[in-house]
């Protein structure tokens, strides 16, 4: 009876009423044998194309997530719903759950948002994965073990090419780890002396230093020449004075 009534509401263009009926079934306020309110709601959103789809999803997703996080998450990443207008509320709903990192990755790779917070969170997640492997801290991409190279290549390319993340926040996340990534972020922040020093003395990679200079410009090339022709590390440190 309730399922039939919900379908009747859909046929009459009253999607909200149908969703309310399925919610009552899903939460046990109404009972009908063989009818799962959660499944009915999820199935509805996969085929409904009304202009109010996004607004309805924002309204009814929380109860679906409370009852079945797995089904709610599967709907969100199914690409059958444009969730770009409601990403913030969804992140609030997911909180610190196990689904959050996968959702952030999905959003970053699916939508052209140019959102600083999401881009920064995405980069932070990837960096923290790499930080679990101390062997990666002082090596270039070419020196990275094959098992980690594809994942690392992805975040290195992201840090170089993405203009949306906060380099200051990412530098804080990096701390003293992952020197290659630090070089890239320091270059973005125009801290060229420190970036080049790490490239030469920690990574021992002139190639990485040159890549830094190509991004930073002529002044960086001058610093690199000074580093390459200085006799000791101490001379370089002294030459920085109060700049560092």
Label for each model-derived stretch:
Residues 1-244:
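Extended alpha-helical solenoid/rod scaffold regions
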């Amino acid at each position: 009876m309730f399922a039939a009534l919900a379908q009747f509401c859909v046929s009459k263009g009253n999607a909200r009423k149908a969703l309310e009926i399925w919610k009552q079934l899903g939460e046990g306020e109404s009972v009908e044998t063989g009818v799962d309110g959660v499944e009915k709601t999820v199935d509805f959103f996969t085929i409904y194309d009304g202009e109010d789809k996004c607004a309805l999803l924002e309204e009814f997703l929380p109860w679906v997530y409370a009852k079945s996080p797995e089904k709610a998450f599967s709907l969100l990443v199914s690409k059958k719903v444009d969730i770009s207008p409601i990403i913030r509320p969804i992140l609030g709903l997911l909180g610190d759950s196990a689904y959050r990192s996968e959702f952030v990755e999905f959003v970053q790779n699916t939508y052209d948002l140019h959102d600083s917070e999401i881009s920064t969170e995405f980069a932070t997640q990837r960096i923290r994965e790499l930080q679990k492997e101390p062997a990666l801290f002082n090596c270039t991409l070419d020196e990275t073990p094959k098992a980690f190279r594809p994942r690392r290549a992805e975040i290195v390319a992201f840090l170089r090419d993405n203009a949306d993340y906060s380099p200051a926040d990412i530098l804080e996340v990096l701390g003293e780890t992952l020197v290659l990534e630090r070089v890239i972020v320091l270059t973005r922040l125009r801290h060229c002396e420190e970036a080049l020093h790490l490239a030469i003395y920690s990574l021992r990679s002139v190639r990485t230093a040159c890549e830094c200079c190509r991004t930073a410009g002529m002044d960086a090339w001058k610093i690199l020449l000074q580093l390459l022709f200085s006799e000791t590390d101490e001379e370089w440190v002294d030459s920085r004075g109060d700049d560092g």
